[in-house]
Swiss-Prot record:
Major localisation: secreted
Recorded GO CC terms: extracellular space
Full protein name: Angiotensinogen
Coiled-coil ranges from the UniProt annotation: none
Glycosylation (residues): 295, 319, 362, 401
UniProt KW Secreted keyword: yes
Length: 476
């Protein structure tokens, strides 16, 4: 069997094969030409007019240094502003990145989900994953940069400078993708979506980081926090200090996101994502309701209820149903429910793959009364573990050339992605009995047993979150 990293690239290249066939004898156009270096950029890189000075560096301040709290309102406004003057090319570039991150997201979600038990759930961010790997690409030189580009799904080996991925374009497009997700609700919308990303760069004392690299991260993570601390003497204490620091700065209850660090690490790269959505037209039901984890175990959780014209599809052949609920004018929540709870893994394997969005075209509008749990999902995963499972354990290992991050011989430890996903009603608590609105009879859809979810931004086609909900208030 081919290594998983290669199969991902092969799948993307198969999807793009039509581009080469259509081109015939014409001048070669890179399938992701909006994301690679232009000829003029290459001329500047290969023949600089003046000698390039070395990148300025700095030493991160100690972790105990007082830090300002994250202002999520300001982060929201910053993302909205980033989408106000988008040109057609910006949107096309975002769509290209959306295609790439979806492919990688499905691939790595499958890898990650194989480590979960049947009763466990989790939430996964393809955007955070792709952003993290792109950040390392920006900080890498060959051969590491070429290996990362191939893993990101962009062909380029042996094709010259104009086939090399421009990491800054990709990071800018990732900011566009995040902005499109939150901008659709508008400033006055009750059901406004919040999306905040914070990166912590934790280094051994005395290690110098290059300023251009750290500044480049601001595209997808407006707040980047470089901090130094002793990582070697007591790795467990170092992990506790990092968790406490991030909790105090963000106010997000991520749990024990980081459990330990490798004592020989000199750099940890941790990305923290907080999503908060409110379901327009939904209300919180009185009291707690039963959610069945399996056939014999239930937990009591808050439930939401709402009636509207939603898109729906029941696939009797594969024993699953899909309900699509708008979170904003351009963002959808997709809820995938197995007809039989024991089939959840089978439905998950069938649904979360590269033809997912094509299959979603089978949905059609109808009146639905939807009841589902309020969600507070937490998950943390180490990209180093995922890379090892994808047969690429050395990609960010000791031999990786990350000279654009630091001139020091970096030893990258854990590369953490942590997600806090919250979904609530936008209305007040509903009365015990809610009269059905006039119109066609509403189909009753109740999610009171394990199901899958996805959050899709329509303009870019990017899937921001994929998840399995087995315990609605705890998915660590």
């Amino acid at each position: 069997m081919a290594p998983a990293g290669l199969s991902l690239g092969a799948a993307i290249l198969c999807l793009l094969a039509w581009a080469g066939l259509a081109a015939g004898d014409r001048v070669y156009v890179h399938p992701f030409h909006l994301l690679v270096y232009s000829k003029s950029n290459c001329d500047q890189l290969e023949k600089p007019s003046v000698e390039t000075p070395p990148d300025p560096t700095f030493t991160p301040v100690p972790i105990q240094t007082k830090s300002s709290a994250v202002d999520e309102e300001a982060l929201w406004e910053q993302l909205v502003r980033a989408t106000e003057k988008l040109e057609a090319e910006d949107r096309l570039r975002a769509s290209e990145v959306g295609l790439l991150l979806n492919f990688m997201g499905f691939h790595m979600y499958k890898t990650l989900s194989e480590t979960w038990s049947v009763a466990s759930g989790a939430v996964f961010s393809p955007v955070a994953l792709f952003s993290t790997l792109t950040s390392f690409y920006v900080g890498a030189l060959d051969p590491t940069a070429s290996r990362l580009q191939a893993f990101l799904g962009v062909p380029g080996e042996g094709q010259g400078c104009t086939s090399r991925l421009d990491g800054h374009k990709v990071l800018s497009s990732l900011q566009t993708i995040q902005g499109l997700l939150v901008a659709q609700g508008g400033a006055s919308s009750q059901a406004r979506l919040l999306l905040s990303t914070v990166v912590g760069l934790f280094t051994a004392p005395g290690l110098h980081l290059k300023q251009p690299f750290v500044q480049s991260l601001s595209s997808f993570a407006p707040i980047t926090l470089p901090r130094s601390l002793d990582l070697s003497t007591d790795p467990n204490l170092a992990a506790e200090k990092i968790n406490r620091f991030m909790q105090s700065v963000t106010g997000w209850n991520m749990g024990r996101a980081l459990t330990a660090v490798s004592p020989d690490s000199t750099l940890l790269f941790n990305a923290y994502v907080h999503f908060q959505g409110k379901m327009k037209g939904f209300s919180l039901l009185p009291g707690l309701k039963e959610f069945w984890v399996d056939n014999t175990t239930s937990v009591s959780v808050p439930m939401l209820s709402g009636t509207g014209i939603f898109h729906f599809w029941s696939d009797s052949q594969n024993n699953l149903s899909v309900t699509r609920v708008p979170l904003s004018a351009n963002t959808y929540l997709l809820l995938i429910q197995p007809h039989h709870t024991p089939d959840l893994r089978k439905v998950e394997a069938l649904t979360f793959q590269h033809n997912f969005l094509t299959r979603m075209k089978n949905l059609s509008p109808r009146a639905i009364h939807l009841t589902m749990p309020q969600l507070t999902l937490k998950a943390s995963y180490d990209l180093q573990d995922l890379l090892a499972q994808a047969k690429l354990p050395t990609l960010l290992g000791a031999e990786a050339n990350l000279s654009k991050i630091s001139d020091a011989n970096l030893r990258v430890g854990k590369v953490l992605n942590s997600v806090l996903f919250e979904l609530k009603a936008d209305g007040e608590q509903a009365p015990e009995s809610v009269p059905q609105p006039a119109g066609p009879e509403a189909l009753e859809v109740t999610l009171n047993s394990p199901f899958l979810l996805a959050v899709l931004e329509r303009s870019s086609g990017a899937l921001h979150f994929l998840g399995r909900v087995s315990r609605p208030l705890s998915a660590e």
